[in-house]
A protein has these predicted regions:
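Extracytoplasmic
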Residues: 1-209
């Protein structure tokens, strides 16, 4: 499990630098039907992957041992309307069980305004897919671990392999970056002294306009 993986790599400290890999700069592919595109929607050297199968592999080198988040910058393609599902290998192996099934969310936006039914009740707007790039750090699909996965990697040469399970997307970038530092409560609460305590009337937000 991921918790066991992190416990086994407790000696690793957060990395100090990031590595960026272009989606189209993969070193190998296996039955993916993936296509390199010189440009798509403002991003260069991207990967178009719409076969729902196969794998692509990227080579990279790290200057130091450290913990890294892995963030994918992608844009969903119209397919079945489900979340994008893939798996990830480091140096040819799954680093932990949870890496075998990773979910990337689709983006949605309102299609039109709030509707009103024949009883006068307001209904949420219909949803339509928002086809623009988003950056998502890989994390537990079940929400057991809230923070993004932290991958423990030694300095030197490595490979990262993505295996597609479901849906289609344009992959613009893979970024290995230091985990974002989370301040402890004592540090955060110390900054609250700058704010005045609210003393006005309660603020009520209606469920309908």
């Amino acid at each position: 499990s991921y918790s066991e993986y992190r416990a086994a790599n407790f000696e690793f400290a957060p990395a100090s630098a990031s590595i960026n890999l272009k989606g189209g700069d993969y070193s190998a592919e296996n039955g993916s039907g993936a296509e390199r595109l010189e440009a798509y929607n403002g991003k260069s050297r991207v990967l178009k992957w719409d076969s729902e199968r196969g794998s692509v592999t990227y080579d990279f080198s790290l200057p130091e041992d450290g913990l890294y988040n892995i963030t994918l910058t992608y844009i969903q393609l119209i397919c079945h309307g489900n979340s994008i599902r893939l798996s990830l290998k480091i140096d040819g192996a799954y680093p932990f069980k949870d890496a075998e099934d990773i979910t990337l969310p689709r983006l949605w936006t309102n299609k039109g305004g709030i509707r009103t039914d024949d009883k006068g009740d307001q209904i949420s707007p219909e949803q339509t897919e928002l086809l623009e790039y988003t950056a998502q750090s890989l994390k537990d699909s079940d929400g057991v671990a809230v923070l993004p996965f932290e991958f423990a990697l030694r300095a030197g040469h490595h490979t990262v392999t993505l295996e597609m399970k479901e849906e289609a997307f344009i992959l613009a970038e893979i970024k290995l970056c230091p985990p974002e530092k989370t301040e402890d409560y004592r540090t955060v609460s110390a900054g609250y002294s700058e704010f005045d305590r609210y003393s006005g009337d309660p603020v009520i937000i209606q469920g309908e306009d």
